Regions:
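The feature marks the mature, well-folded catalytic cores of soluble enzymes
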Residues: 1-265, 269, 275-313
C-alpha cells in the first residue's frame, strides 16, 4: 500500500491577468505576423512558458540590436522597460508592442508625476530585477533604490524634504510594510502612491500561502529562480509555519525521496506559472503516493487586461 500524503492546495495560485495578457500578446502577434516574433527578455519568468512560445515561433533576445530581421515585430516583456527602449525601437524603425503589465505601467506614471513635481523618489525593490530597471528608467532624475530598512536609514535626503515612494509590484507584503514604516518614521513629509503598488495577484497568492503554511511539513512553490514573486512565496511559506519550503522549477526532476518522513505538503504556483504544472506535479505525486487533496476555498479573481486592438488578427 502506498504511503499517504495530505496535499494542501493554495488558492488563488498561478497566472495573473498581466501574465495572461503578455502571453496572449505574443500569440496574437504570431497569428497576425507569422514567425518569427521577437521578444525582448523572457515575456514572463517561467521556463515552461518561454519554451512553449519558442516552439510556436517566438525568438527571445535581451537587446534590440540582436534582431536580425528589422522588418519583424518585437514585444517588450511584462516587467516593463526603461524609456530608452521604445526610443531605440523607433530609431531602428522597428514595429514594437509593449506587454508591460498595466499595474507596472501605473507605477511608471506615478514616477513621472512625482518627477514633474520635483519630489525625490524612493523605489522599494530588488536591484537588477527587470521591473526595477524599467521603473528607474522612466526619468533622468535620480531614483533612490532601497531593498531593506537599513537602506532607508542611509538615504542622503533631508528629513523635512517632501519625498515620494513607489514599490516593485512583486515584493513581500510583510517586508514592504516594514520598509514603508521606516520611510514614514525617517521623513516628515511622505507622499504615498494613491493605491498600493504591490499587485493584487502578489498579495492574494501570499495570503493564500499564509493560510495553509502552518499545516505543512513541506511547501512546494512552482516557479522560476529569477522570478521575484516565486521567491517571495517560498519566504512566506517558511515565515508562516511550513517546516521546509522549496522552489520547484522542473517537476520532472523533483526527487520524491524528500517526502519519506513527510505527511503534509502545501502546493502553490507563482503568478508566472501555469496551472498545467500544478496538475503535472499532482499527477507525479499520485503515481507514487496515496493522496488526500485539500483544495482551498477562495474567491476567483476577476481581473482581465485587454490585448491592444492593433494586435488582433
Amino acid at each position: 500500500m502506498s504511503k499517504e500524503l495530505n496535499i494542501y492546495l493554495a488558492g488563488p495560485r498561478g497566472f495573473c491577468a498581466g501574465v495572461d495578457r503578455a502571453i496572449e500578446m505574443v500569440k496574437e502577434a504570431l497569428k497576425k505576423y507569422g514567425k518569427p516574433v521577437y521578444v525582448r527578455h523572457e515575456i514572463v519568468h517561467n521556463k515552461y512558458v518561454v519554451e512553449n512560445l519558442k516552439s510556436e515561433g517566438a525568438v527571445f533576445i535581451e537587446e534590440l540590436n540582436e534582431i536580425k530581421d528589422k522588418s519583424r515585430p518585437v514585444i517588450f516583456s511584462a516587467h516593463g522597460v526603461p524609456k530608452s527602449v521604445p526610443q531605440e525601437a523607433l530609431d531602428l524603425n522597428l514595429l514594437y508592442f509593449d506587454a508591460t503589465c498595466p499595474l507596472v505601467s501605473k507605477i511608471h506614471k506615478e514616477v513621472e508625476f512625482f518627477d514633474r513635481k520635483q519630489f525625490p523618489v524612493i523605489l522599494i525593490g530588488h536591484r537588477n530585477h527587470p521591473e526595477v530597471i524599467g521603473t528607474m528608467g522612466q526619468t533622468k532624475s535620480e531614483i533612490f533604490l532601497v531593498e531593506t530598512v537599513e537602506d532607508v536609514i542611509k538615504l542622503p535626503l533631508n528629513k523635512d524634504e517632501k519625498i515620494a515612494y513607489v514599490t516593485q509590484t512583486t515584493l513581500s507584503v510583510d517586508d514592504t510594510k516594514d520598509i514603508v514604516t521606516e520611510v514614514k518614521k525617517r521623513f516628515n513629509n511622505v507622499i504615498e502612491p494613491k493605491k498600493n503598488d504591490i499587485c493584487y495577484a502578489t498579495t492574494n497568492r501570499q495570503e493564500a500561502v499564509k493560510k495553509i503554511a502552518s499545516n505543512c511539513d513541506y511547501f512546494l512553490v512552482i516557479g522560476a529562480s529569477n522570478s521575484s514573486n516565486s521567491l517571495r512565496l517560498v519566504e512566506v511559506a517558511k515565515n508562516y509555519g511550513s517546516k521546509k519550503a522549496i522552489l520547484v522549477e522542473d517537476v520532472d526532476s523533483l526527487n520524491l525521496n524528500i517526502f519519506e518522513n513527510i505527511e503534509n505538503i502545501g502546493i502553490t504556483a507563482s503568478a508566472s506559472s501555469p496551472e498545467i504544472l500544478v496538475k503535472k506535479l499532482i499527477d507525479k505525486l499520485k503515481n507514487n503516493f496515496d493522496l488526500k487533496i485539500n483544495e482551498a476555498h477562495y474567491q476567483k479573481e476577476k481581473v482581465y487586461f485587454k490585448v491592444p486592438q492593433k494586435l488582433k488578427s
